[in-house]
Amino acid sequence: MSTEIKTQVVVLGAGPAGYSAAFRCADLGLETVIVERYNTLGGVCLNVGCIPSKALLHVAKVIEEAKALAEHGIVFGEPKTDIDKIRTWKEKVINQLTGGLAGMAKGRKVKVVNGLGKFTGANTLEVEGENGKTVINFDNAIIAAGSRPIQLPFIPHEDPRIWDSTDALELKEVPERLLVMGGGIIGLEMGTVYHALGSQIDVVEMFDQVIPAADKDIVKVFTKRISKKFNLMLETKVTAVEAKEDGIYVTMEGKKAPAEPQRYDAVLVAIGRVPNGKNLDAGKAGVEVDDRGFIRVDKQLRTNVPHIFAIGDIVGQPMLAHKGVHEGHVAAEVIAGKKHYFDPKVIPSIAYTEPEVAWVGLTEKEAKEKGISYETATFPWAASGRAIASDCADGMTKLIFDKESHRVIGGAIVGTNGGELLGEIGLAIEMGCDAEDIALTIHAHPTLHESVGLAAEVFEGSITDLPNPKAKKK
């Protein structure tokens, strides 16, 4: 069965970038159609990414906190995990959010076409779905087709014991021994979940630190804590993977590589993602796609074809949902005739591990590469009353300031709920705040949040909660 429809805007992909673009288009009075390969809206993020991982991380955190409370005089029995019920909880979270999106699409009169969409011309798209073919004629298109996990040619990915992030989130079983390939955010988050559920975790990372994009001093605090849970093999890489009946045998080389191949019950490959740009027949619409699958856009998110836009993972790093959402808003507003641009000063990054690692703006490495003269100020949570009382005093808040203007240009937090504390720093950078602006803002006490203000006081030389290195000598 084949049908044909006409619309002002078609959005290819319904992840956070795609549905945000579609809903914004509808709110601006544009007739809008979403094409989505999943049966529900939300894309990778809501279905097999950000949201289910946070549901499982919540479970992991509760398990770990229950164990830790013994030191405070509250002793529980050994946690008993029911994997089926945990999986049901995860699915409940997903269904609540995807159901909400379906309701908002209906309320906005956004038509949803399920299936795989590919371009057949500059103004036509063909969707292959379970119910047949749908041809969509459009005036404008927004490509939000996302990304997928990287696969390596020497790894037998067809073996069910070789996982990507989607497989790990299915929570089919808890392996006795799990290897995480890649010390980035996805691998560490999944390692956190499976460690809490009982797995022995090895992490192999080719760089000299996990979370390579973050500053070393922040990662050092994190590594000290996480090393008690994971066996970290830094400056090491996997060279061979062999699937046998009794397990997956992995050969490694490098600084921490074992001498012999190691047997694992499962291997999670979490070494990054690649864009889906080559899967759309975008060339038939005249849209240029580079060798890696990325689509180049300008600050209004236009491709080289003026009426076709691209947003989200498919336009480049960082591959983060919140970046894609803002890109989606801009693309919709430009189509509606507004002179808007995507030109953020900062895009925050967060590893939702325990402790969390979060940063925004420039890192020290980036400031050095740009030739910026900078100064850092840190506030250790060991001096925070709230952190000590909440048993999370191993955290740290760090601000990076331009040495001449004293404006904040970057910041990072490592500690419990660190990501929740990052917003003030991001806003300060966007608004051009300097150290004095932050230091003179009264922060509630006792909170973890006040560590941002106290770090600014360290820079200003007005700190009284720590020895003051800038105090006048007597």
UniProtKB/Swiss-Prot annotation:
Annotated binding of NAD(+), by residue: G182, G183, G184, I185, I186, E205, V238, A270, I271, G272, R273
Keyword Lyase: no
Gene3D superfamilies per the UniProt record, alphabetical: 3.30.390.30, FAD/NAD(P)-binding domain
Cofactor list: FAD
Residues that bind FAD: E36, R37, Y38, N39, T40, L41, G42, G43, V44, C45, K54, G117, D313, A321
Residue numbers annotated as active site: H445
Family annotation (SUPFAM superfamilies): FAD/NAD(P)-binding domain (SSF51905), FAD/NAD-linked reductases, dimerisation (C-terminal) domain (SSF55424)
EC number: 1.8.1.4
Keywords attached to this entry: Acetylation, Cell inner membrane, Cell membrane, Cytoplasm, Disulfide bond, FAD, Flavoprotein, Membrane, NAD, Oxidoreductase, Redox-active center
Gene Ontology, cellular component aspect: cytoplasm; cytosol; glycine cleavage complex; membrane; oxoglutarate dehydrogenase complex; plasma membrane; pyruvate dehydrogenase complex
Miscellaneous comment: The active site is a redox-active disulfide bond.
NCBIfam families: lipoamide_DH
Protein name: Dihydrolipoyl dehydrogenase
Lineage: Bacteria, Pseudomonadati, Pseudomonadota, Gammaproteobacteria, Enterobacterales
